[in-house]
């Protein structure tokens, strides 16, 4: 059985945000049934860097936005692999945000 409700893994995503972004003040993590997004919420950038996991039907889409353009997009049917990719993009986002 494939999990399709991201909200069931709310604690997992919250802990991921805390572990990667604990030293960064201006980040947020929003979680709903159909998506989870971690983003830079500083007022400096009108189009902030973010990483997002979305459910679209039977597919899971992971987006990595570097603040300038869509840097990466990953689409897959397997929830566990989508979570792994979300984690990789989150780590990448944390590294980039820590430079500024």
Spell out what each predicted region is.
Residues 1-45, 69, 99-100:
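Negatively charged, low-complexity tracts enriched in Asp/Glu with abundant Ser/Thr
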Residues 28-30, 35-38, 52-54, 59-61, ...:
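Ser/Thr- (and often Asn-) enriched beta-sheet segments in non-cytosolic proteins
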Residues 45-71:
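Short aromatic-glycine-(Arg/Gly/Cys) micro-motifs in beta-strand/loop hairpins
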Residues 67-81:
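A short, exposed loop/beta-hairpin motif centered on an aromatic-Gly-Thr core
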Residues 82, 86-90:
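Short amphipathic C-terminal alpha-helix that caps PH/PH-like domains
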Residues 92-100:
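Short, Lys/Arg-rich amphipathic alpha-helical interaction segments
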């Amino acid at each position: 059985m494939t999990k399709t409700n991201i909200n069931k893994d709310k604690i997992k995503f919250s802990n991921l945000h805390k572990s990667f972004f604990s030293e960064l003040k201006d980040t947020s993590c929003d979680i709903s049934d159909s998506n989870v997004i971690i983003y830079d919420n500083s007022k400096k950038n009108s189009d902030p860097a973010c990483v997002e996991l979305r459910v679209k039907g039977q597919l899971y889409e992971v987006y990595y936005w570097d603040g300038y353009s869509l840097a990466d997009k990953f689409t897959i049917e397997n929830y566990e692999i989508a979570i792994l990719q979300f984690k990789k993009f989150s780590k990448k986002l944390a590294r980039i945000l820590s430079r500024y």
